[in-house]
Amino acid sequence: NQTAEMDLINILLAYMETPQYLRKRLFRLRPELRYVGVLPPLRTPHHPLNRKMKNLKVGEYREGAVVSQTKEGTLLDIGVEHPALIANKQFPISERITVKIIKIGKRVEVELANRNEVPKYWGYVITVEKHPFGKLVKSRGFDLTIATSKYGVPLADVTEEIAEKWKRAKTILVGFGAPTQGLYEILENEGTSLESVVDFVVNTIPMQGTETVRTEEALIASLAILNMKFNLCIRR
């Protein structure tokens, strides 16, 4: 049941990305979340540990959820003792909003912020895509597309080529196979070939030893290598 599996992964990823202080407000009790206690905390900048108003700083960014509306504006839970005010604006109850702290006193005042303006990593956005992989790649117009496969070329053989495209790319897709099928099989079932829809097919786990690698393990291993090879090297 791929639809149910997509929905499960979607809600688990959304739950993990949500700051801990907002989870009870934004997620109702449901069976899919019964084991979320074993999920590792992200410890990203938008998951602050501070719960005290006195420790907030002007200019700090926070994620908030609307708790009520007043004549003055909208009150938000931003993870401290009392709600913060965003003046002269009204938002639906429970809507999640990114804000910037502009005043700290008896009441914290905030302004609406675009998460793209935050100078730190501010979490991820989840999109459930129902198109087949090949159609997704072709329709989105990614600047760089990389497929991972044990049948791909060693990453070391194409490092320079990928680096050149990586420098100029604003949107990058990294594709992984499913637990029961690799990307070669998936694209063959779609009536096309993997090489025809992506720029590179690479093996990020050479000499893996096992017949298959779990998708979640391949994600960690591959993204760590790509980050080290390209993001860090290019910044230098």
Report each predicted region and the residues it spans.
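Post-transcriptional modification and biogenesis factors for structured RNAs
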Residues: N1-R236
